[in-house]
Structures are given as C-alpha cells and as structure tokens.
C-alpha cells in the first residue's frame, strides 16, 4: 500500500479556492448586517490568515464572495491580504451558481476541475454545489451557529458540541463534500480532497 504522504504529494494541485467573506474569513458568527459592522467582526477568523498564506505559497488563486453591500464588505475585508480577490455581487442571487462562476472568471480560471468553495453560509454552499465545485462547510464559524467568538467561548463544551453537531448535520444535509469546524482545519481537508480527486472522484 502506498505511503499516505507519497499519495498526497502525487495528488493534483488545486485550481482555485473561493471563500465566503462574512462567517468564514472574517466575522466569525456572521453577525454583520447591511448597515452594521461590529468592530470585533473585522478580525480574521481562526486559521484564516495562515491558510491564505499557505495557499499563496502554493500559487493557488483565491477570492471571497459575499452578498453584503460594499460599504460593509470593504471594512470586513480590510484584515485580509491584498492579493485575495474580492468579487462583485452577481446579478443572480445565491443559491444560483452565477456568483461562483463569476468569481472564477474574475480569477481567469478556465475550468471547474480542482476548484473549491469554503463557507459557513448554506445558501453560498448551495451555489457552489450548483456550480459544480467541491464544497467545504464550516460548522462552528458561520450563520448556522451565529455566535461571536466571545459568545462561542462562553458556552460550555457540551453546548458547543451540541451546536457544532447540529450545524454539521445541516451542512451534510445540503450535500457538501466535507465539513470542518473552522479554517484552522482546512489544510488537512484540502489534502483529503486531493486524495479523492486522485482516486477519480468528482464533485
């Protein structure tokens, strides 16, 4: 049997990774609204900057998507590296696939193979599924739990596990390909998708 690391090294590289903005890269609990941006929510979520840095070293194009107006997304995205592309809202709202396709076109991506969407927002994940992308749902970080980092940490372990499990079931119910807790776990998940692609699996 091949060594897992050898298999992972032979896995095809990623073509592009799309992220939700609010409730994924920033705004842990997806609490920003059309007219309000809580100051704490402009901070990058756990693991976000590290995984973006890693993807950049791999030469993987990345972009974020959101349906909030520019007056909200601009301050939200301020904590992110400048090379991460911010996409204009698509004319067709989620869960239509147009936003994902538009984002890939803005990144000059010519094909869907190896393209991944990461989000904690069910409607955006549905958009990714409809677009033919690999999709990774975030259980604790996003609108399904809807808690700020402080509120999340204030819960006891049993309450956190209950919310996490409920969100995980809901995400798999959408049909997503993988579910992780937060972006700190994304590297391992992307490696797993690489192995699945190596075996011929399609999204």
Feature map (PLM): residue ranges:
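Nucleotide-state-sensitive switch-loop elements of NTP-binding domains
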Residues: 62-64
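Conserved phosphate-coupling serine/threonine residues in phosphotransfer and NTP-handling enzymes
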Residues: 66-68
């Amino acid at each position: 049997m091949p060594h897992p690391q050898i298999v992972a090294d032979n896995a095809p590289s990623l073509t592009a990774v799309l992220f939700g903005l609010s409730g994924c890269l920033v705004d842990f609990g997806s609490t920003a609204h059309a007219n309000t941006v809580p100051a704490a929510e402009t901070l990058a979520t756990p693991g976000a900057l590290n995984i973006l840095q890693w993807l950049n070293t791999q030469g993987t194009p990345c972009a974020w998507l959101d349906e909030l107006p520019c007056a909200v997304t601009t301050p939200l995205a301020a904590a992110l590296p400048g090379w991460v592309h911010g996409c204009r809202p698509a004319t067709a709202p989620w869960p239509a696939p147009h936003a994902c396709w538009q984002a890939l076109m803005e990144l000059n991506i010519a094909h869907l193979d190896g393209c991944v969407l990461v989000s904690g927002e069910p409607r955006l994940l549905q958009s990714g599924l409809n677009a033919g992308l690999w999709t990774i749902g975030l259980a604790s970080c996003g609108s399904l739990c809807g808690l700020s980092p402080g509120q999340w940490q204030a819960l006891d372990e049993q309450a956190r596990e209950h919310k996490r499990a409920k969100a995980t079931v809901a995400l798999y119910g959408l049909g997503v390909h993988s579910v992780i807790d937060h972006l700190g776990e994304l590297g391992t998940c992307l490696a797993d998708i690489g192995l699945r692609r190596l075996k011929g699996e399609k999204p």
